[in-house]
Amino acid sequence: MKMIVTGAGRGLGREIVKEAVRRGHEVAAGLRSLDTNMDPLQELKDLASGRLTLLELDVDEEESVLKAKEAMAAKWGALDALVNNAGILLAREQSIEQLEFAAVENTFRTNLLGPMKMVKHFLPLLKNSDNPCILNVSSEAGCFSWAHGRDYPYGLSKAALNFFSAGLRKELSPQGFAVYALHPGWIRTPMGGSEAPGDPADTAQNILDLIEGKIEADAEAWMIDREGKAMPF
């Protein structure tokens, strides 16, 4: 399987890359810059027998996405799985009166427009796969049933990502695509914090199981947890 993972420099993204390589897949690890956060992945690359590509990819910048697409089109020609994992968390616990809208704009640029750019430009490669899968790493924070104040940039961006995922599923599922928004759970990452109960390595295993079909997601679900169970939106 050929797979691209955005936001692969740390946290859940790095664990997904590690697990995918361990399972023998060909993986492109999207990194905003090849000058930072590379050491653990470089060590993995040395052990991956050519199956790991470190790909300079800033999802905030459409030109960067286009360059990455051209590079992988030349290298692979097809793509089986796109994992849109890159995300940011800004201005948490700020009231609406405290909120600066630059934080909202920046969060939407990464958390929503980033995945949209990735899907738009990598779709031709995904269409060359027999079993294409798009997995958008989202959050229950974007579900109306979970909404609370003081989490506006992140929660709103994930709600929009969930809506995008639902629409994309309706558009692409007739063409044989699997499309999901996935809530990974509260896990110990730079975003989730050290107090989180979940291990990102365990979540990465579940994500690979979902992509490989070892875990069957609920048939009509587009918003799922790491076990493939439908989540209320």
Show which residues each predicted segment covers.
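Hydrophobic positions on the long internal alpha-helix
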Residues: 83, 118-122, 126, 164-165
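Catalytic loop of short-chain dehydrogenase/reductase
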Residues: 88-108, 127-174
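The beta1-alpha1 cofactor-binding region of Rossmann-like NAD(H)/NADP(H)-dependent oxidoreductases
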Residues: 56-67
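Conserved glycine-rich Rossmann-like NAD(P)H-binding loop of the short-chain dehydrogenase/reductase
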Residues: 23-39
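N-terminal Rossmann NAD(P)H-binding glycine-rich loop of SDR-like oxidoreductase domains
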Residues: 9, 13-18
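Structural signature of the Rossmann-like NAD(P)-dependent dehydrogenase/reductase core
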Residues: 5-6, 84-85, 132-139, 178-183
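C-terminal helical subdomain
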Residues: 174, 181-187, 193-233
